[in-house]
């Protein structure tokens, strides 16, 4: 079952505005890349989330990291970069390749890699401008612990289809939040 059109359009609108206010020179295609990653994550759904209600889990999403008011641009970019890097790593595991359509997974890797490359170029521009640390150590740890909890959950659930569906939906929410941070 596909994502409802209204939800998909909301995700597209949110991600289209994501790179407009960053303090560096991201290519105009960056926001399209965000949209593409969200759409790919939506297309990757293989089973109904309703059949997996018993597997739901609170991964402790670090919302405070993604509240844009506390960050300057370099810290926000760094938080988004770390999040995308962790998503890339999560979907690069052995258990992931068995769970998803290989073609969609390859497209997701490509999209995430492109986002990482663009953000790294942006970070290198920002490092020369500011001397403040790129990302608060507590924020970095919060993001990494969040993804560790997700990885542990998958391991405990033996990488079941329902576990991956729960994680896919969580990653869509996480990616959308990190995208929103870019526009703050």
From Swiss-Prot:
Q: Which residues form the signal peptide?
A: 1-23
GO MF term set: cytokine activity; type I interferon receptor binding
Q: Which cysteines are joined by disulfide bonds?
A: 24-122, 52-162
Similarity comment text for this entry: Belongs to the alpha/beta interferon family.
Protein role? Produced by macrophages, IFN-alpha have antiviral activities.
Subunit details: Interacts with IFNAR2.
What is the name of this protein? Interferon alpha-2
**Native source organism of the sequence:** Equus caballus
